């Protein structure tokens, strides 16, 4: 058989095999077109489960007369015009295939009128070449699509239709999903002349729970926990049922939407399931209605014929974001705020990237710790609030720390009598707390230094380790902690959990905050030196180390962490070496006076100089 171009009707019928699975598929495509047209009211009439009639009328913007024929053509759409549009789709439809595919397997008529037109027009396609006929009609502003005798010309497809009741149940489920996505649209559904569903539009700021209860039932509404979670371009809102009271009937309620598009996505379901796993049995499923808003450039919806699936460009970030959002509202059910004596509760801190969710936002502010924390007092001049348990989460943290170091370095020396040798002492003292001048980098991780005419070699990785230990060792106040954007959740044994609970006070002084449940521990904050580390490796090793200890001293733990940190630089530059030495000289002056083994090695150049002179 020679290669040939398929007739338009046959090509459309092949496409319909992917798009039009059953009457519910037709309803989905046509209602989504109505929503894209800006409709605020949609009336859906079904007869015999959709096998005989599917009629959908809306009050959207309508279609112009000269565009009606194009509307029934393949790959004709008003929703995208370029590749840039395809990479950031905001409409529900975009391929321009639905009407052509549906008209090829049914008797379809399209009647529409725009606000600018005085009369409406009706179009329908027929024949082998799908020629479109347009004629005048009576119709208000908006569009009506009527699909008669679905699959009349494809008997093989028609015989696979289920009973009238089953097919209508599928249509009813599609309308339920769409009604949950668009609270601002009135949707009426009738079957065989009887109104079955009436979903009235909810005004902006109105009670969405009323429609939620009408669709999902009062049992779900009674157990629903509201979620409001945001980070950057990601927003998660909706409801999740309390897993402790989830029944098999409730578990059937699993509705998820991405940018308003109903979705069945494995990644999203896995994140929700993982957040609920400690509270659900092995054979139980979570119940939820969740809405994910994401930058359209960060999600690809053109990966499934029926658009049931999407692909996220940063799938791990999306997974962990959803997981943490759901987990936060579930943990709120178990947590109660600790009493803070008789002190008034400080006002909530403004957080640019996150806003408080239902419960508490662990991306920005972890729960209060049990160990006694030092009391902070507000700065008298700045007018700022008292320091939070996470002082480094405030924008001015680095600047404040630098100011403290500067004040320490500029502390005036005791007054001395004006004796002759005294003026040289400050210079000598300053010189004694310096490793010297960095000449170059040798073998990528050693610095060649010059001081008072002497040459020495310094191991930068060892100096970095001593600096990290100094930064991690608590002084008069605990080490400042920084909350993790995505908290780290790890499974632990009973022995490891017991060790963590015993070491909680010491870890809190080191800036490590965690929360544990039956079989897991969630690391919510770490000190600054650990932010750039691979915590997936470091934290399990730290837990293993703690499980072998009987005494938990912050200094010993800090030393262990410092020895097990990976260097931030595989190959050092001059600028990085100079910065490191400046920090070491400031925080660890004792290393300059008495360098430990493995840090500094003097280099004797006299034999080399003598050899050169002897030549």
Swiss-Prot record:
PANTHER family: DNA MISMATCH REPAIR PROTEIN MLH, PMS, MUTL (PTHR10073), DNA MISMATCH REPAIR PROTEIN MLH1 (PTHR10073:SF12). The gene is mutL. It holds the Pfam family MutL_C. One of its GO terms (molecular function) is ATP binding. PROSITE patterns: DNA_MISMATCH_REPAIR_1. Residues 364-391 have a biased composition (Low complexity). The keyword DNA repair applies. It comes from the Bacteria. One of its GO terms (biological process) is mismatch repair. CDD domains: HATPase_MutL-MLH-PMS-like, MutL_Trans_MutL. This is DNA mismatch repair protein MutL. Belongs to the DNA mismatch repair MutL/HexB family. It comes from Escherichia coli (strain ATCC 8739 / DSM 1576 / NBRC 3972 / NCIMB 8545 / WDCM 00012 / Crooks). Residues 363-397 are annotated as: Disordered. GO terms for cellular component: mismatch repair complex. The keyword Transmembrane helix does not apply. Keywords: DNA damage, DNA repair. Gene3D superfamilies: 3.30.230.10, Histidine kinase-like ATPase, C-terminal domain (3.30.565.10), MutL, C-terminal domain, dimerisation subdomain (3.30.1540.20), MutL, C-terminal domain, regulatory subdomain (3.30.1370.100). This protein is involved in the repair of mismatches in DNA. It is required for dam-dependent methyl-directed DNA mismatch repair. May act as a 'molecular matchmaker', a protein that promotes the formation of a stable complex between two or more DNA-binding proteins in an ATP-dependent manner without itself being part of a final effector complex. HAMAP family: DNA_mis_repair.
């Amino acid at each position: 058989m020679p290669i040939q171009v398929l007739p338009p009707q046959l090509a459309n019928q092949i496409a319909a095999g992917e798009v039009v699975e059953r009457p519910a598929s037709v309803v989905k495509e046509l209602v989504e077109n109505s929503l894209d047209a800006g409709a605020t009211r949609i009336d859906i009439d079904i007869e015999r489960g959709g096998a005989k009639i599917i009629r959908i009328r809306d009050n959207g913007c309508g279609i112009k007369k000269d565009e009606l024929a194009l509307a029934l053509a393949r790959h004709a759409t008003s929703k995208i015009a370029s590749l840039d549009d395809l990479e950031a789709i905001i409409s529900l439809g975009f391929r321009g295939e639905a009407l052509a595919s549906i008209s090829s397997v049914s008797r379809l008529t399209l009647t529409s009128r725009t606000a600018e037109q005085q009369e409406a027009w009706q179009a329908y396609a027929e024949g082998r070449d799908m020629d479109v006929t347009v004629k005048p009609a009576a119709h208000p502003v908006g569009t009506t699509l009527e699909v008669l005798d679905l699959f009349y010309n494809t008997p093989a497809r028609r015989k696979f239709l289920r009973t009238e009741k089953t097919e209508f149940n599928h249509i009813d489920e599609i309308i339920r999903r769409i009604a949950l996505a668009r609270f601002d649209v009135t949707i009426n559904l009738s079957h065989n002349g009887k109104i079955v569903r009436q979903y009235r539009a909810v005004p902006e700021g109105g009670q969405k729970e009323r429609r939620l209860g009408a669709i999902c039932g009062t049992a779900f509404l009674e157990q629903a926990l509201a979620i409001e979670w945001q980070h950057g371009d990601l927003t998660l809102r909706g409801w999740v049922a309390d897993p402790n009271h989830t029944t098999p009937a409730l578990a059937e309620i699993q509705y998820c939407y991405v940018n308003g598009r109903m979705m069945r996505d494995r990644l999203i379901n896995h994140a929700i399931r993982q957040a609920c796993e400690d509270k659900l049995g092995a054979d139980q499923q979570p119940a939820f209605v969740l809405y994910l808003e994401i930058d359209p450039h960060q999600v690809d919806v053109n990966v499934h014929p029926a658009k049931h699936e999407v692909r996220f460009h940063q799938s791990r970030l999306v997974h962990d974001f959803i997981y943490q959002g759901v987990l936060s509202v579930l943990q709120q059910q178990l947590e109660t705020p600790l009493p803070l004596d008789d002190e008034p509760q400080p006002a909530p801190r403004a957080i640019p990237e996150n806003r408080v969710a239902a419960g508490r936002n662990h991306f920005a502010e972890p729960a209060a710790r049990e160990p006694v924390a030092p009391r902070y007092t507000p700065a008298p001049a700045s007018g700022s609030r008292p320091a939070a348990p996470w002082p480094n989460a405030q924008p001015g943290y680095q600047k404040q720390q630098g100011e403290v170091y500067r004040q320490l370095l500029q502390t005036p020396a005791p007054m001395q009598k004006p004796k002759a040798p005294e003026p040289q002492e400050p210079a000598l003292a300053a010189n004694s707390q310096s490793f010297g001048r960095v000449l170059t980098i040798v073998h990528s991780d050693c610095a060649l230094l010059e001081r008072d005419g002497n040459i020495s070699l310094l191991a930068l990785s060892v100096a970095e380790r001593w600096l990290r230990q100094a930064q991690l060792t608590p002084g008069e106040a605990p080490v400042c902690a920084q909350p993790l954007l995505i908290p780290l959740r790890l499974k632990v044994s009973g022995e490891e959990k017991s060790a963590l609970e015993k070491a909680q006070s010491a870890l809190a002084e080191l800036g490590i905050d965690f929360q544990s449940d039956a079989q897991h521990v969630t690391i919510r904050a770490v000190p600054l030196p650990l932010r750039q580390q691979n915590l997936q490796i470091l934290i399990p090793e730290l837990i293993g180390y703690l499980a072998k200890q009987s005494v938990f001293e912050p200094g010993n733990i800090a030393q262990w962490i410092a020895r097990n940190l990976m260097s931030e630089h595989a190959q050092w530059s001059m600028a990085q070496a100079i910065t490191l030495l400046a920090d070491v000289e400031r925080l660890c002056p004792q290393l300059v006076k008495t360098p430990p083994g493995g840090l500094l090695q003097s280099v004797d150049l006299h034999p080399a100089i003598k050899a050169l002179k002897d030549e």
